[in-house]
């Protein structure tokens, strides 16, 4: 991986879309006032993800993965220009916004990586630490590499993993908003106009975010850090509503119009209704579980096993050469765990563990104490072939198609549009999907009672 270098400084847009502050002329050399961005096949998109407390496991610790571009946008480009074969990732912005008071003591880490790689060292693109005491943190970087539109891993060619610490919110609230913007360019055969032909992953700008090395996370070896990626989960979704409106630019619209595309996404079946907050009741989970492949170390060509929490990670590193012992599931055959809250199920699990004489604890005060079951992960593609609806991930998408360079402009105006795919137009709750063979009790706590003993590896 190329060494990260300091690139062009830009002013991060406050209260707007950070990716809109990135000049296309910073990345490409053929930008001209006489050429439209649409003619150059340059697109600006932004996704907005809501992170719910059910997506955050005990002690305010949670790691989630976010693909950057929905396949529906790729299909739209292919319909307009069938000869298009590749997409170049020009710039990427990641904004993490706190939906709570300032100076609450919430911080975290963010990784940008290419999930198509098998090794962590080659997959890593960018990593930084952020602090939400000021309410928001943003990093803008340039991945600067192309991907084939026929690649089954297109949606995962740039993924963002965000880990929060000390985020102790109650169930069914929205404490965090993650905005991921990208500037990409579609092309046919070869893109010779890229200015930086040597480096990838160079930093453009940062606000309340500090780029970090591996040592800053308390790990000594890269292959140990790669274990962290076995926590990652992705949420396959479908577009349920599409809107498009135009915003006049300049005086009386003399500067033209800015086209805004808005996508709303949902996970699970189309008939799933929006859930209202109801403390003590857990949200039903989709059964379409899938696992994200883990990374292998370049030194040890073996696949890393799935771990539940950071304590599992530490225990695994200490005992990686020793015997692996399984943890018995506390959900016995014939027991009913439906229609109870996650906390009630946790207490029932702890009581069952005491009766069975189990030595494992699910949670303890002052730390994340959960022991996981190691297991191999299945390789599953998250992108479908051309002509089929792919895997879209997100809650909201805004696209810019402006003549020339795009700068930070306010986005406002009435909302109006139409439905697609026949789904409900109301926003829907994103559901986390399975992340591999995890500890059974930890799965039940996070994902609900449908994760039964058949999720445990057959060897145990």
Curated annotation (Swiss-Prot):
GO terms for biological process: proteolysis; symbiont-mediated suppression of host innate immune response; transport of virus in host, cell to cell. Signal peptide: none annotated. The keyword Kinase does not apply. The keyword RNA-binding does not apply. Residues 368-379 have a biased composition (Basic residues). GO terms for molecular function: serine-type endopeptidase activity. Residues 267-314, 349-460 are annotated as: Disordered. Keywords: Host-virus interaction, Inhibition of host innate immune response by virus, Suppressor of RNA silencing, Transport, Viral immunoevasion, Viral movement protein. Belongs to the tobamoviruses movement protein family. Suppressor of viral-induced RNA silencing. This is Putative movement protein. It comes from Apple chlorotic leaf spot virus (isolate plum P863) (ACLSV). The lineage of its organism: Viruses, Riboviria, Orthornavirae, Kitrinoviricota, Alsuviricetes.
């Amino acid at each position: 991986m190329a060494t990260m270098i300091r690139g062009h400084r830009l002013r991060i847009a406050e209260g707007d879309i950070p990716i809109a502050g990135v000049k296309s002329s910073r990345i490409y050399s053929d930008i001209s006032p006489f050429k439209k961005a649409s003619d150059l096949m340059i697109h600006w998109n932004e996704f907005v993800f809501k992170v719910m407390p059910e997506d955050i496991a005990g002690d305010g610790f949670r790691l989630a993965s976010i693909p950057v571009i929905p396949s529906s946008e790729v299909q739209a480009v292919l319909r307009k220009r069938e000869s298009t074969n590749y997409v170049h990732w020009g710039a990427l912005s990641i904004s993490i916004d706190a939906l709570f008071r300032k100076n609450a003591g919430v911080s975290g880490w963010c990784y940008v990586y290419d999930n198509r790689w098998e090794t962590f060292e080659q997959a890593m693109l960018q990593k930084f630490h952020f602090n939400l005491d000021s309410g928001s943190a943003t990093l803008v970087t340039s991945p600067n590499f192309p991907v084939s539109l026929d690649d089954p891993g297109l949606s995962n060619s740039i993924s963002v993993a965000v880990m929060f610490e000390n985020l102790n919110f109650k169930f069914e609230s929205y404490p965090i908003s993650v905005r991921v913007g990208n500037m990409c360019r579609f092309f046919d055969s070869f893109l010779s106009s890229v200015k930086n032909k040597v480096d990838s992953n160079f930093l453009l700008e940062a606000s309340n975010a500090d780029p970090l090395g591996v040592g800053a996370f308390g790990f000594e070896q890269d292959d140990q850090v790669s274990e962290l990626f076995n926590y990652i989960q992705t949420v396959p979704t479908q577009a349920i509503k599409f809107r498009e409106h135009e915003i006049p630019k300049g005086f009386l619209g003399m500067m033209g119009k800015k086209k805004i595309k808005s996508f709303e996404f949902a996970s699970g079946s189309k008939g799933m209704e929006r859930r209202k907050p109801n403390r003590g009741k857990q949200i039903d989970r989709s059964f379409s579980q899938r696992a994200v492949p883990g990374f292998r170390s370049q030194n040890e060509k073996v696949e890393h096993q799935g771990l539940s929490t950071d304590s599992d990670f530490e225990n695994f590193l200490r005992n990686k050469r020793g015997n692996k012992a399984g943890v018995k599931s506390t959900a016995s055959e014939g027991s009913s765990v439906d229609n109870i809250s996650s906390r009630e199920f946790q207490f029932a699990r702890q009581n069952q563990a005491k009766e069975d004489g189990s030595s494992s604890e699910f949670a303890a005060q002052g730390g994340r104490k959960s022991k996981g079951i190691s297991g191999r992960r299945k390789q599953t593609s998250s992108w479908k072939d051309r002509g089929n609806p792919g895997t879209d991930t997100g809650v909201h998408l805004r696209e810019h198609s402006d003549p020339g360079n795009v700068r930070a402009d306010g986005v406002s105006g009435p909302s109006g549009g139409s439905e697609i795919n026949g789904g409900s137009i109301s926003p829907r709750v994103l559901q986390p999907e399975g992340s591999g063979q995890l500890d059974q009790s930890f799965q039940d706590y996070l994902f609900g009672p449908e994760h039964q003993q058949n999720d445990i590896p057959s060897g145990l």
